[in-house]
Amino acid sequence: MKKIVLYGGQFNPIHTAHMIVASEVFHELQPDEFYFLPSFMSPLKKHNNFIDVQHRLTMIQMIIDELGFGDICDDEIKRGGQSYTYDTIKAFKEQHKDSELYFVIGTDQYNQLEKWYQIEYLKEMVTFVVVNRDKNSQNVDNAMIAIQIPRVDISSTMIRQRVSEGKSIQVLVPKSVENYIKGEGLYEH
């Protein structure tokens, strides 16, 4: 049975902390396949400074090239509009019948899982991998995996704000992503 990890997020933009999460999960679980799953629109997030999806996909590919593993699952992008993880996982599972699916979330998402659409069915389809960046270890449900990672206080919101203020984002994102953001004039206003 194949072990497949799905790491969802807006990735607007993808940054160094996302890379750390991906790397820690990849090396801990050693999956057969690892997918970044960019959302078109998350039902539980604000959509400020929304850029063209192609820019996000390009930056994710840059991260994949740098990490040396991973692929992009663009199911939610193709579907457009608001995407629910349940619908995405259900469709993905139909394409990957003989697979164990692992879905990466942060403690912030873990704490609001009960708000997720069809969460009880979703829990039956995937094993949640809860990534914790706090000092204290995370207590999770028995059917979930908790992975402690180094705390890195970087957010996509912070990066967008720094760019709009003309501040440096060096080391917050890989050089390739920094150059891309500057070259395309992303997040400048």
Curated annotation (Swiss-Prot):
Pfam families: CTP_transf_like
Keyword Metal-binding appears in the UniProt entry: no
BP-aspect Gene Ontology terms: NAD biosynthetic process
Annotated InterPro entries: Cyt_trans-like, NadD/NMNAT, Rossmann-like_a/b/a_fold
Domain of life: Bacteria
An annotated Gene Ontology molecular function: nicotinate-nucleotide adenylyltransferase activity
SUPFAM superfamilies membership: Nucleotidylyl transferase (SSF52374)
Catalytic reaction(s) noted: nicotinate beta-D-ribonucleotide + ATP + H(+) = deamido-NAD(+) + diphosphate
Pathway named in the protein's UniProt entry: Cofactor biosynthesis; NAD(+) biosynthesis; deamido-NAD(+) from nicotinate D-ribonucleotide: step 1/1
Keywords assigned by UniProt, alphabetized: ATP-binding, NAD, Nucleotide-binding, Nucleotidyltransferase, Pyridine nucleotide biosynthesis, Transferase
Enzyme Commission (EC) number: 2.7.7.18
Function: Catalyzes the reversible adenylation of nicotinate mononucleotide (NaMN) to nicotinic acid adenine dinucleotide (NaAD).
Family to which this protein belongs: Belongs to the NadD family.
Xref: HAMAP family: NaMN_adenylyltr
Listed name of the protein: Probable nicotinate-nucleotide adenylyltransferase
Species: Staphylococcus aureus (strain bovine RF122 / ET3-1)
